Amino acid sequence: YYVDLQNR
């Protein structure tokens, strides 16, 4: 899952 850089 890739949604870490967009949230932080």
Swiss-Prot record:
It catalyses: 2 a phenolic donor + H2O2 = 2 a phenolic radical donor + 2 H2O. Binds 2 calcium ions per subunit. Binds 1 heme b (iron(II)-protoporphyrin IX) group per subunit. GO terms for cellular component: extracellular region. It comes from the Eukaryota. Keywords: Calcium, Cell wall, Heme, Hydrogen peroxide, Iron, Metal-binding, Oxidoreductase, Peroxidase, Secreted. It is found in: Secreted; Secreted, Cell wall. One of its GO terms (molecular function) is lactoperoxidase activity. Belongs to the peroxidase family. Classical plant (class III) peroxidase subfamily. This is Peroxidase 4. It comes from Cycas revoluta (Sago palm).
